[in-house]
């Protein structure tokens, strides 16, 4: 049984008197212990999907789905209070810009201890004294912070961005989640720090069997760490496949464009040569094209593309394109 099963998730915003679809019929199934990647440009709806899973909705949002189940529990039928309780016990989220997510006026140790739920205590009643501090030290060691004394008495601005993100991961692990959502956890970090964070998440997945949803705009990075990747464009899923298969044999032109945009430092490039990017820009939600949303930018677009393509293909490799690429190799 899948841990998270989403079918035809749609998220709409109310702008004035009209509703605008920001996410359109996105489906996703995550199994226990899986690392799933979610990739797309800024504005493709990646963070909105994560917030919809956690139930963090605004008043001008309308979230609908044919199915949204977490471990055989229908999230759509739960009240707001029941949803918060379920998510608080089973789901954690890591946000972008960790320093802005921490309270600048509180020491890191106090913030970490405040986020350790009482129900996670498993010892005897006479051992409860100081257990949150011991648990906080254990979590800091678990995420790779060896000098816990210095980290716990520091304020967030006294730590590096990488250390703050490790603290945020420790806070996310405090409730022992079954699903960890990482929304661009290494955005604007140095490559060495990025590798440390992703190695840490992979180790947590292997040791605790924690399911991880990795959200990023970097396809090259996701292909190294995720088991399977969903590619989003303008709020729609355009391709889903195992990581290696997606990178070596993409079927959708947008996926191919993301792969070609990855710089190749192994070969020399002519001076002032153009990068392999798609022409144009991602359309506004209020001005979406008819049919395939990539149509105006797609180099392979034809007359049939005015009809919205359905997600089709094999069980492990789905694509939404009338003229898929690399089909002769299968």
UniProtKB/Swiss-Prot annotation:
Effect of residue 46 to G/I/Q/R: 25% to 50% stimulation of K(+) uptake by TrkH
Protein's recorded name: Putrescine export system ATP-binding protein SapD
Chief location category: membrane
Ligand binding (ATP): 40-47
Organism, scientific name: Escherichia coli (strain K12)
Gene: sapD
Keyword annotations: ATP-binding, Cell inner membrane, Cell membrane, Ion transport, Membrane, Nucleotide-binding, Potassium, Potassium transport, Transport
Role this protein plays: Part of a putrescine export transport system, does not play a role in resistance to antimicrobial peptides. Stimulates K(+)-uptake proteins TrkG and TrkH to import K(+), may act via ATP-binding rather than ATP hydrolysis.
Membrane topology: Peripheral membrane protein
Recorded phenotype for the gene knockout or disruption: Single mutation, decreased extracellular putrescine, in an sapBCDF operon deletion no change in resistance to antimicrobial peptide LL-37.
Domain of life according to the entry: Bacteria
InterPro entries, alphabetized: AAA+_ATPase, ABC_Ni/Peptide_Import, ABC_transporter-like_ATP-bd, Oligopep_ABC_C, P-loop_NTPase
GO annotation, biological process: peptide transport; potassium ion transmembrane transport; putrescine transport
């Amino acid at each position: 049984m899948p841990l998270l099963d989403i079918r035809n998730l749609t998220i709409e915003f109310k702008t004035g008197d009209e509703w605008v679809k920001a996410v359109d019929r996105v489906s996703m199934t995550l199994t226990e212990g899986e690392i799933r990647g979610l990739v797309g440009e800024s504005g493709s709806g990646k963070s909105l999907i994560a917030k919809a899973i956690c139930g963090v909705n605004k008043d001008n949002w309308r979230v609908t789905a044919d199915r949204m189940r977490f471990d055989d529990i229908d999230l759509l039928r739960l009240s707001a209070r029941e949803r918060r309780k379920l998510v608080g016990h089973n789901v954690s989220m890591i946000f972008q810009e960790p320093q802005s997510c921490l309270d600048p006026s509180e020491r890191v140790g106090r913030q970490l201890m405040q986020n350790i739920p009482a129900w996670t205590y498993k010892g005897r009643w006479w051992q409860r004294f100081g257990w949150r501090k011991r648990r906080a030290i254990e979590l800091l060691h678990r995420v790779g912070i060896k000098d816990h004394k210095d980290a716990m008495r520091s304020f967030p601005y006294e730590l590096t961005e990488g250390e703050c993100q490790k603290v945020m991961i420790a806070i996310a692990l405090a409730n022992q989640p079954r699903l960890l959502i990482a929304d661009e956890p290494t955005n604007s970090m140095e490559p060495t720090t990025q590798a440390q964070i992703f190695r840490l998440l992979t180790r947590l997945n292997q040791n605790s069997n924690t399911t991880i949803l990795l959200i990023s705009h970097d396809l090259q990075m996701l292909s190294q760490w995720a088991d399977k990747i969903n590619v989003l464009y303008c709020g729609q899923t355009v391709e889903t496949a195992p990581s290696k298969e997606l990178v070596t044999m993409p079927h959708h032109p947008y996926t191919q464009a993301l792969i070609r945009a990855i710089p190749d430092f192994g070969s020399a490039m002519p001076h002032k040569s153009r990068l392999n990017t798609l022409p144009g820009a991602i359309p506004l939600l209020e001005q979406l094209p008819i049919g395939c949303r990539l149509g105006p930018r797609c180099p392979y677009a034809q007359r049939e593309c005015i009809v919205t393509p359905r997600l089709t293909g094999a069980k492990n490799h789905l694509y939404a394109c009338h003229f898929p690429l690399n089909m002769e190799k299968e």
